[in-house]
Amino acid sequence: MPITVEIVDVGVEERFFDEVFSYFDYVDKKFSTYKDNSEISKINRKEIQEVDFSPDMKQVFQLSEETKKITKGYFDIKSKDGQYDPSGLVKGWAIHNAAQILIRHGFVNFYVEAGGDIQAHGKNSHGENWRVGIRNPLNQEEIIKVIGLSGNGIATSGTYVRGQHIYNPHDIENKILDILSLTVIGKNVYEADRFATAAFAMGKDGIYFIEEFPGLEGYMVDKNGIATMTTGFKNNVLE
């Protein structure tokens, strides 16, 4: 997936970007279910037992189990055939960790984006909050909302780009057809990503889960193109 990093502080050198992109390469090689030699693929083939999981894999499994409990089973990295796919959590987790790399180097004004999910810090080159567009799932050329971000993260789950890749673990056989996209703003992109995935799996009820969850705001577009937003979402809207 495309990855974008922008830093507007002084003292930026190519090595800082290299470090971030190297980290994403590491994550991809470890967690990609499309790579036969990744750790997660070896786990799915039962070539690696839990006791021998790497520290990062153990952390991701722990966070996934925690998210499953919080969402009452709507987030589950284990499919019905027993295979594990932690991608619904790993992307946001990796973006958040990449942002921490830049923070440790002393950077204040930057954003990190991967596959449409974003962690933003500080201000953009105009001294304003970072501007993020939410696409219309019925017309991807159209931006239907512009959000201002600073020190928080945003993630969108949906079926309008990749098709039906998210399922309701409580009703696996039926596709999620009543909504097309659900965008979540959280204190960081990791929080936004994992709960966007879980909320989308809930269908139309997902926006109410986001409404009631502390620290999250959401924006849902249903199959008819009708949007529903949480109470505080408007506080993040620029246009």
Region roles according to the model:
Residues 1-239:
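Mature catalytic core of soluble alpha/beta enzymes
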